């Protein structure tokens, strides 16, 4: 269960609180102690209102909320990482469950996505012990030759580190080869909570926090668009959540000027159903108010990331709508196919009409976007 911090930031009276809010409105970088205060002590209504003011200053079209149509395809479910929060993966010897998606299956899924107005594949996969750089180069180049108009938003920092390791390459060279083969952008998958202790507890075999940061920085240096994520609500403390945000902010600050860097930040709640963490006694304890606090603090701490996404898939329609008034400006994708989070207990669904209606009900105008946040 979440081990909430009981320590409180000392000496934060009304005047100091106003100073912190003013700093947020100016989009100045917050100190760790200021960020802790926002998360642990700031009244939620004040916090959400301040985050909404910052959101309206950052995103020029005040009444617009963006959304996307893409399709998630799992390249394989074979994974040697053994993350304790995932019940979708299988081990290499579990041949009755193991799969690698075939080219015919990709074609069928892509044709269906295009018919629904989609423009992007979100390709996710495990750390397969036998799928190295040659496999991914062939996959990406083949898909691009067949569907040049489809963007490939694929893998994640852990997969890149794993491919590099089994292929005898550096992560930088691996990224270069993947980009040359057709990789358009890199998801923020595999971040979870960027804390070595948390990682040891929930995903001990996954590439390290340092490797995640290294791969993302190299992607930024290559001007490969990326996103950042946080999966919260398992074994982490509130301050480890804030520290995660500070690591993301500081990594974004290292992005070369004029490069894409992190285009968006997406926090989502851990779903425990059927996972090893659940067997260890760690269960989903979703609080809508806690999620709104996280969205608001994310907007205020991440002063250098423009887009904050409301994860309707894991929190549901109503909470996502409130998040749009608390710092978030994007509703993400209708996600034509999603398996990993759904297999752990998240069963919220939207079609194109439904997500637009949800945005309108929240008082905004829906606008369809692509991965670079360009309007379609």
Which residues make up each language-model segment?
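Conserved Radical SAM active-site core
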Residues: 37, 90-250
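Generic secondary-structure signature for well-ordered alpha-helical cores
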Residues: 25-26, 40, 53-60, 115, ...
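Hydrophobic faces of well-ordered beta-strands that scaffold small-molecule active sites
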Residues: 65-71, 121, 152-156, 186-188, ...
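Conserved, mostly hydrophobic/aromatic
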Residues: 27, 51, 83, 123, ...
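Auxiliary Fe-S-binding modules of radical SAM enzymes
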Residues: 1-45, 114-115, 245-246, 253-376
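N-terminal pre-triad scaffold of radical SAM enzymes
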Residues: 48-92, 98-124
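Short, small-residue-rich loop/turn micro-motifs
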Residues: 77-79, 87, 117, 189-190, ...
């Amino acid at each position: 269960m979440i081990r909430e911090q009981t320590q409180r930031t000392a000496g934060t009276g009304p005047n100091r609180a106003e100073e912190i809010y003013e700093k947020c409105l100016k989009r100045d970088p917050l100190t760790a102690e200021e960020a802790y205060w926002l998360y642990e002590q700031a009244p939620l209504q004040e916090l959400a209102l301040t985050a909404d003011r910052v959101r309206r200053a950052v995103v020029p079209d005040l009444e617009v909320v963006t959304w996307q149509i893409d399709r998630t395809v799992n390249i394989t479910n074979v994974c040697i990482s053994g993350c304790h929060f995932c019940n979708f993966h299988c081990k290499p010897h579990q041949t009755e469950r193991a799969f690698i998606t075939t080219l015919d299956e990709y074609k069928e899924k892509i044709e269906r996505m295009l018919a629904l107005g989609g423009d992007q594949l979100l390709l996710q996969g495990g750390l397969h012990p036998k799928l190295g750089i040659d496999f991914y180069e062939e996959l990406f180049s083949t898909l691009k030759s067949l569907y040049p108009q489809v963007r490939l938003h694929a893998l994640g920092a852990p997969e890149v580190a794993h491919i590099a390791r089994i292929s005898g390459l550096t992560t930088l060279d691996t990224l270069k080869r993947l980009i040359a083969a057709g990789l358009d952008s890199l998801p923020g998958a595999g971040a979870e909570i960027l804390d070595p202790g948390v990682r040891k507890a929930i995903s001990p075999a996954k590439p390290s926090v340092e490797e995640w940061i290294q791969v993302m920085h190299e992607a930024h240096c290559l001007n490969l668009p990326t996103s950042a994520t946080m999966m919260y609500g398992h074994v982490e403390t509130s301050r480890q959540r804030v520290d995660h945000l500070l690591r993301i902010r500081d990594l974004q600050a290292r992005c070369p000027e004029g490069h894409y860097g992190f285009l968006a930040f997406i926090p989502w709640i851990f779903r425990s159903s059927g996972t090893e963490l659940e067997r260890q006694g760690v269960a989903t304890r979703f609080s809508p108010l806690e999620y709104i606090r996280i969205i608001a603090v994310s907007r205020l701490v991440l002063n250098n990331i423009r887009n904050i996404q409301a994860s309707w898939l894991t929190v549901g329609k109503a909470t996502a709508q409130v998040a749009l008034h608390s710092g978030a400006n994007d509703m993400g994708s209708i996600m034509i196919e999603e398996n990993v989070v759904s297999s752990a207990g998240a069963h919220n669904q939207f079609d194109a009409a439904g997500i637009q209606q949800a945005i309108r009900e929240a008082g905004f105008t829906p606008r369809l976007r692509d991965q670079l946040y360009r309007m379609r």
